[in-house]
């Protein structure tokens, strides 16, 4: 992933690339960009290694199942430190979580538990859920009435998210 991002990101910025790594050897570009607009590369990253790669070489990261605590304590500090060490601008942190605007929080969490149970069985998601201090995907989901959901989304931005998708 590291080498791939080191090649792909500059190509999608319209730059020429000459790269020789352990796995890839590439001389290419510059590529023709639609309307000359660079394409940002965002790496799906939850763990320390890929957050480092994203910070060093990409425009940012896209997460899934990382709640505000996980973003503040784990995702944002790691990716920002990597970007800073590489002399790069602050990265985008795109946070994705299930969202349900519903008056019955227990019912909404019950549905979320069924719909997103698979994530609770996968090691990478188990780690990010634990980092966020929750037992499973249903507990990470943003649920409640409009005011509650709005506050929970705002907490993601306060934790370091630059974008939120739901």
What spans do the regions from the language model cover?
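Active-site-adjacent structural elements that line small-molecule/cofactor binding pockets in enzymes
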Residues: 1-166
């Amino acid at each position: 992933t590291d080498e791939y991002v080191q090649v792909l990101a500059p190509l999608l910025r319209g730059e020429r690339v000459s790269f020789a790594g352990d796995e890839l050897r590439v001389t290419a570009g510059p590529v023709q960009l639609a309307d000359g607009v660079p394409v940002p590369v965002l790496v799906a990253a939850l763990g320390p290694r890929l957050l480092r790669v994203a910070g060093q070489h990409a425009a940012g990261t896209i997460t899934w199942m990382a709640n505000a605590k996980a973003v503040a304590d784990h995702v944002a500090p790691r990716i920002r430190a990597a970007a800073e060490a590489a002399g790069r601008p602050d990265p985008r942190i795109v946070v994705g979580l299930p969202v349900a605007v519903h008056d019955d929080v227990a019912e909404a969490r019950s549905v979320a538990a069924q719909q997103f149970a698979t994530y609770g069985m996968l090691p990478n998601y188990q780690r990010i859920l634990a980092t966020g201090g929750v037992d499973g995907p249903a507990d990470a989901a943003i649920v409640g009435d409009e005011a509650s959901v709005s506050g929970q989304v705002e907490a993601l931005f306060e934790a370091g998210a630059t974008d939120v998708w739901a």
